[in-house]
């Protein structure tokens, strides 16, 4: 049996409107991020910086009321910590690597990974060259996985993420 989970990466397609989440939930969407690589009405990105906005807080509240999971991939460090202050449910990073292994703003710090674990969430590492390291190969990908395993020895909060479109 195969299954899929519908996700929203960057809710620009519906004008970042929290009121539209219920409609999307009825359509089968269960995971939502707050943006992609640019600042938007909900939050700052890893490129632009900036925290969670009031509209972003409303978006998270509505998504979690519906039972949707928040994906923190692509957001700024400040927005990440703002989300951790307001979340009432597990948070995931569907495709974010370890910043300790590759110092890129898209990757998670050890403290961020620990916080995701505390919520009961999961971090899915990816194989996109820019986020893996200067010599991206299978060994370097494994370095991210092994680093997360040092922080979460049971591996309950680690997954293989997406972003395979960025793999060369």
Protein language model features and the residues they cover:
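Hydrophobic faces of well-ordered beta-strands that scaffold small-molecule active sites
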Residues: 4-8, 32-34, 70-72, 91-94, ...
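Active-site histidine-anchored catalytic micro-motif
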Residues: 31-41, 54, 63
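Short acidic/histidine-rich active-site segments
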Residues: 127, 153-168
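Short, small-residue-rich loop/turn micro-motifs
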Residues: 36-38, 87, 162-164
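Acidic/histidine-rich helix-loop elements
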Residues: 15, 38-52, 99-106, 127-139, ...
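Histidine/acidic residue-rich metal-binding segments in metalloenzymes
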Residues: 16-26, 47-92, 105-121, 139-156
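Extended substrate/RNA-proximal surfaces in nucleic-acid metabolism proteins
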Residues: 2-4, 8-12, 16-38
């Amino acid at each position: 049996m195969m299954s899929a989970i519908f996700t929203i990466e960057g809710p620009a397609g519906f004008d970042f409107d929290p009121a539209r989440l219920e409609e999307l939930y009825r359509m089968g969407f269960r995971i939502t991020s707050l943006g992609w690589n640019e600042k938007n009405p909900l939050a700052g990105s890893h490129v632009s910086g900036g925290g969670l906005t009031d509209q972003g807080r409303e978006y998270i509240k509505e998504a979690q009321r519906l039972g949707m999971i928040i994906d923190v991939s692509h957001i700024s460090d400040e927005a990440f910590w703002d989300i951790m202050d307001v979340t009432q449910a597990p948070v995931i990073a569907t495709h974010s690597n370890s910043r300790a292994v590759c110092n890129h703003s898209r990757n998670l710090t050890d403290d961020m990974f620990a916080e995701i674990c505390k919520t009961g969430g999961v971090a899915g590492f990816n194989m996109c060259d820019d986020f893996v390291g200067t010599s991206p190969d299978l060994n370097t990908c494994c370095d991210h996985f092994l680093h997360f395993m040092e922080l979460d020895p049971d591996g309950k909060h680690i997954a293989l993420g997406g972003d395979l479109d960025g793999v060369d």
